[in-house]
Amino acid sequence: MPALNERAHELCEAMAAEADRLGIVVSALGCGTRIIDCGVKTPGSVEAGRRLAHICLAGLGDVFIATTDQDSPTSQAVRVATNAPIAACMASQYAGWEVKGEKFFAMGSGPMRAGACREELFKDIGNCEQPEVCVGVLETRKLPPDAVCTSIAEKCQITPDKLTLLVAPTSSIAGTIQIVARSVETTLHKLHVLGFDLSRIVSGIGKAPLPPVADDDLVAIGRTNDAILYGGDVTLSVRGDDASIAEIGPRVPSNSSPDHGRPFREIFARYNHDFYRIDPLLFSPGLVKFVNVETGQRHAFGQLAPDVLAESFAKK
């Protein structure tokens, strides 16, 4: 199987070839880094967002825009499926890299994380790479300057001209879609925090309602988080014993956190907009199901909260 960055690079090539149709802008910085703007200075599109999410997964998962259930406050949902959950979600999609520079900040995800392999997480999951090319996704409102791109390239041990960065703010079509496409990823991350053996997970399927695109990032952060916290519905196929699933299961969905129950913007404001003060156990889907492929047992934990979603999606 091709390496994560190699797979993502091929997807970027195809995306760049259809830039006009996708509503994106492709450019090169002075240092040589290729920038694919999916929503900073260009409107982007639904398809650009779907492909952005696909690249976040290094192509190891399928991303669909689908219809929602009748009790959802929105008509569309983002569905994700992967048969390589650790590589796709944890080694690539998880936004584990804080990218910083002079007057610049972004949350970094994508397979460049496996190229840099600087996070403690990789000691547990492996999947480090020594790539010839690297691909990253930046959640930010600014396009990265040369200095930031050069720094990323150095950490990935490549030259800047071998780096591709896709950029979209939260309050953009593409940015909203790629965040809502993290239903399975947030489940795996929560399980890792709880000490569950991720190698037991065979595959994952998830969906979350696609909220209206907001006109500012703070509103967008609230809506996209709520989409997963209160509308995320994930099913994991797993191996091993059922007793451990029954024991850990109640701690997996978002309602295991005392912060659960109100729109995320309210929770965020309560903690003075400091993510690190929010209970980390909040960040997981509303409903999580396990299907044991060895015993045939099914376990379900949590519940959806369409009333909270409706309140969140209506707020401006």
Could you tell me what each predicted segment is?
Residues M1-C156, D161-E185, H189, V193-K316:
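Anaerobic metallocofactor- and corrinoid-dependent redox/one-carbon enzyme cores
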